[in-house]
Amino acid sequence: MDFNVSPIVAMITRVNGNEISVIDEITMEGSNTFEMAEELLNRYPDNRLWVYPDASGQARKTSSNTSDHHILRNAGFILKVKSINPPVKDRIAAVNTSLKAVDGSVKLTVDPKCRHLIKCISGQTYKEGTRVPDKNSNLDHMNDALGYL
């Protein structure tokens, strides 16, 4: 999950050994963590859900007495999160390797209904002459969320 106001995004995945299948996605414009938690619970009411969120969600906001992580825990989610996010280049390498490893194996599959994620993966651009994702394209949020997994 990647925390933003526009958009806040989440992917629903199934993990089987080393294989990850993205089976659904949620993109909410002008929203917040409370609403995302509610949407996840509405879509998957009888499932035990683990959330792999952005590590920055542990910080309380000046406008609130709580954090994004606290909101998710209070909603009943199990959080799998490190104290800091891995470096961007490491997350990109991990996702790229999952899409297709050197040996040709594929460890990450994406359901065709996950159109926003597919658009983000295929359309991600980088700042000229760098390996730094271009945040102006607005195609980075789903990719960031995928990298937290």
Please place each PLM-identified region on the residue numbering.
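Residue-level detector of short, conserved catalytic/binding motifs and their immediate flanks
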Residues: 8, 49, 143
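Short, well-structured alpha-helical interface segments that form or flank functional binding sites
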Residues: 5, 67, 140
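Acidic, Mg2+-coordinating catalytic module of metal-dependent nucleases/exonucleases
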Residues: 135-149
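Mg2+-dependent endonuclease catalytic cores in nucleic-acid-processing enzymes, primarily RNase H-like
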Residues: 17-134
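Gly/Thr-rich phosphate-binding beta-strand-loop-beta motif of the actin/hexokinase/Hsp70
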Residues: 1-15
